[in-house]
Amino acid sequence: AARAVVCVNGTNALYMSLLLSGVEKGDEVITQPLTFIATANAISYLNAVPVFCDVDEDTMGLSPFAVRKWLEENAEIKNGACYNKSTSRKISAVVPMHTFGHPVHLDEFVKLCEEWKIALVEDAAESIGSFYKGKHTGLFGKVAALSFNGNKIITTGGGGMIVSNNLFFSNKIHLFIL
């Protein structure tokens, strides 16, 4: 990544990644139920609402096909943003987590997020060193979160990191840390 900024832990990295991506109070964020609680907690800390979609059998990560189906049935684009038709809440981000280092179908998520005007925030806490089609995980969205907790691939006993190739995001990250 062009920039990497350390923070206190992976939950904090997810929280700040969501904040940088424009998630606000009352928004909905799509993620997966098969994950560490930090993913849903980071969404909740912003007073946003986690929406759970199913995982793929082959990756054990969030299924872009299940997300697409859910969006087609429950969402609409209004004024350049995605909204839940039944709750009227803005759907501002999708957070796939690369379970046990198995990358989700990232090319599908990139297309889906562009089409539905939703930010892609990768939870790459379990996939440091993993590749998807020759590219490291954590580099497909504008921002990604890593964790160095004791049960992760690389550990410092704790700590997290935000990575981004987007210069606007990476410059803004420092403002949140300071």
Where are these regions (language model features)?
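Conserved N-terminal alpha-helix of the aminotransferase class I/II PLP-enzyme fold
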Residues: 1-10
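PLP-dependent aminotransferase-like
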Residues: 19-99, 103-115, 119-124, 131
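Buried hydrophobic packing segments
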Residues: 13-18, 39, 160
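Conserved core segment of the aminotransferase class I/II
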Residues: 150-178
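Short acidic capping loops at alpha-helix termini that bridge into adjacent secondary structure
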Residues: 2-3, 25-28, 171-172
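Conserved active-site segment immediately N-terminal to the catalytic lysine
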Residues: 122-156
